[in-house]
Amino acid sequence: MSQKEIQESLDLLEKHWDFDPILRKFVLGKITVVTDFAIKVKDVIFHVPYLNSEKKYILWKWFWPDCHNCCDRQGRLPLTSDDLITIGKGLKYKNTADFIKNETLTVTYDEPGPSGQMTTMTTINLKRKIDETAEEDGTHISCRFLDDAGACSMHPDRPGVCYLYPFASWLENEQGKARVHATYQFTGDCPGFYLADNLDQMKEELRAYSTTIYDYNMASNRTNREGFSAVSFS
């Protein structure tokens, strides 16, 4: 996302939520003296920003069902091969091919990696609206499965990527072993971030997310091997 898009998202967020002005400056790239604090929880290494000037960590808490911006404003919903089966069955499709044909889009897009290296992704994405087109990939569209109460009509069989928010994750090769890493997505859409002196308040969330994030990365990697998605680096 561009800084302009993030600022627009923050402006929209602040119409309904109080958002710490220090965090706003950080999200907009105006605070740059930041330490990447890495902590291993089970099989995932989390990268938590530490603001040196404030001597504070950035933590996160869940505001659902009062907030469901992650469902209203996600840019895409890439599916794993597991998702193709479970969601297809949930939508009463007798075979996966018909589900893919009618309910998904195959798109190719570029994403910056954690080191700044560009990654080209090709994924099968769930349509967030019935008539979504490939040209709308990456734009904010409210998910058609979100009901008036802020709940997902597919739950618990919603896409695996939905369970990751607000984290982004990736794999790194460490001495021949794949290691899962995760950090926050700062898109300007989530009111759940706050400043804290230590990580104690978020220990339970990190434990729960470590399992979710690890399992998703294994499923995503398997999806690549099975030919339902592709990744290349430039």
Language model features: what each stretch is:
Residues M1-S234:
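Short loop/turn segments that flank or connect secondary-structure elements
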